[in-house]
A protein has these predicted regions:
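Extended hydrophobic
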Residues: 48-118
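Intrinsically disordered, low-complexity terminal regulatory regions
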Residues: 1-8, 109-125
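Short, solvent-exposed recognition segments
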Residues: 4-73
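Short, surface-exposed, charge-dense and proline/glycine-enriched linear segments
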Residues: 18-29, 77, 95-105, 125
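Conserved protein kinase catalytic core
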Residues: 1, 11, 104
């Protein structure tokens, strides 16, 4: 469920509406949340997902994930987990935009910023 969305003041505007429910089967946000979910949830979702258990292990190893045209054609995204005080992943923070602007490997530009933002959010929880 999307809880916050920010749009640029001008130009392309294509955000996920607050309150929108997105499938857990595609996209960087889904991969982050599923990578840290319980094994039962993973087993229920993975058969219909566009990614694999190995992909989720890569997310846990790296600590963030990127995708290009996975959930929506022409859109690239990067996501990182947000943890509560006990270390449990409770949310994902993401940035997305047109592949033409973000490229097919948007993590090179955005991963460090997202990890910093996730850390700041975690401190406020």
């Amino acid at each position: 469920v999307c809880v916050v969305a920010l749009e640029p003041p001008a130009g392309l505007r294509d955000t996920v509406p607050v309150g929108a429910r997105l499938p857990m089967t595609a996209g960087s946000g889904a991969r982050v949340l599923l990578a840290y979910s319980d094994p039962g949830t993973q087993q229920a979702v993975l058969p219909s997902a566009v990614f694999t258990e190995r992909t989720l292990a890569d997310v846990r190893r790296r600590g963030w994930v990127q995708s290009a045209a996975e959930r929506e054609p022409g859109v690239a995204s990067v996501s990182a987990p947000v943890r509560d005080r006990s270390g449990t992943v409770v949310a994902a923070v993401s940035v997305s935009g047109p592949i033409d602007r973000m490229g097919r490997r948007p993590g090179a530009r955005w991963a460090a910023d997202l990890l910093a933002a996730a850390g700041e959010l975690a401190q406020r929880l």
